[in-house]
Amino acid sequence: PLEALNVQLYNVEVXXTNDKGEADXPGEIQ
């Protein structure tokens, strides 16, 4: 889905991802 792709792009820009490509902190988009 596009939402998942957008989250991945957001995480790449911010640089805050875990090994699953998800946000690694509660204050970030998940």
UniProtKB/Swiss-Prot annotation:
Annotated source species: Rattus norvegicus (Rat)
Q: Name one GO cellular component term.
A: plasma membrane
Indicate the principal place this protein occupies in or around the cell.
membrane
Give the keywords, sorted. Answer: Cell membrane, Membrane
The subunit field of the Swiss-Prot or TrEMBL record says: Binds to carcinoembryonic antigen (CEA).
> Which cysteines bridge via disulfide bonds?
none
Note whether Cell membrane occurs among the keywords.
Answer: yes
Q: What is this protein called?
A: 80 kDa carcinoembryonic antigen-binding protein
